Amino acid sequence: MIPYGKQSISEEDINEVVKVLRSDFITQGPLVPKFEKKISNYTGARYCVAVNSATSALHIACLALDLGIGDYLWTSPNSFVASANCALYCGAKVDFVDIDESTFNISISELEKKLEVAKAENKLPKIVVPVHFSGASCEMERIFELSKIYGFKVLEDASHAVGADYKSTKVGSCQFSDMAVFSFHPVKIITTAEGGVVLTNNQNFAEKMRTLRSHGITKDSESFVADFSGPWKYEQQDLGFNYRLTDIQACLGISQLKRLDEFVAKRRDLARKYSDEFRDVSGIEIPSTDFLETSSWHLYVIRVKSSAKREPLFNYLRNQGIGVNVHYIPIHLQPFYKNLGFKKGDFPSSEDYYE
């Protein structure tokens, strides 16, 4: 079976992990900050905070942006549920913005219309989470412009887009956002087994997230509230979590990062070949070639024009040993979100894309 997604682990990756297993620190050692620094250098963002998953990254990013009860977070229905769940973890409400029918990312025109309505109703979002579906960046410059007009923060869910480009920057630079999140799950571009990071250019956000990922505890004496002495001193200043990444995972990430550009180049080459081969095949639609050289191509999505033929094709390919998958069932159509009041017909472009 050709899997839907699979990590690429080299002998160098294995050797680096073995070195850490033989070292003094397998967690809370020097390699997590080293990994963070390398990701910062790659993307151009000033700060990077590594955690145990992209879901955790979205959660602490929302908390650092003070999302809470009474607030709204907007995101795309065409994503994994974590893009929306992060709002609910904070006690906030979630809503969605329908997608563009050619890019399958958040529709700028739908966002503009929804913001005007929300302004009139005094229900503007505190955070908007654009999702870079399949590895192609949303129109971040325009979204960032809208954030200045309407007063919301921008948190990029770039889980699919490690190594992707946008205009003259790397996705994750946060040139047009307040924060960006990467995923290092094994099916993504590079892996740390499980893991994720938050990138930002705001020092206060970074410091807040570093505290939140480790139980809300700080050992920075300059930030202590109480007047205690002793080199053993630490303070819990917030209600945090155990979202730490281990040194074992960080060293794998450091090793994988050396091949990131190679991985992305190979994915772009495959996307180019797929597009050439499938362009004249009847009954299907292939992805837009507008972002052929900028997407990281986490996914190459073929749309079957007849929904009645999708499942037979899916089963046929699986039976031929090709591990295809379907992305995504719109979040608002999940039973949990239907119980929150969402229903079929709320976001027709996302529903049409899925169907």
Regions found by a protein language model. Give the residues of each.
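Short aromatic/hydrophobic contact patches that present stacked aromatics
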Residues: 3, 127, 181, 197, ...
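Phosphate-binding glycine-rich loop
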Residues: 25-72, 86-90, 96-98, 120
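PLP-dependent aminotransferase class I/II
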Residues: 32-37, 45-49, 55, 109-113, ...
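Structural detector of well-ordered beta-strand residues that form the stable sheet scaffold
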Residues: 49, 74, 95, 154-155, ...
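PLP-dependent aminotransferase-like
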Residues: 63-149, 153-158, 165
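Conserved active-site segment immediately N-terminal to the catalytic lysine
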Residues: 156, 160-191, 232-236
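Active-site PLP attachment segment
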Residues: 175-219, 247
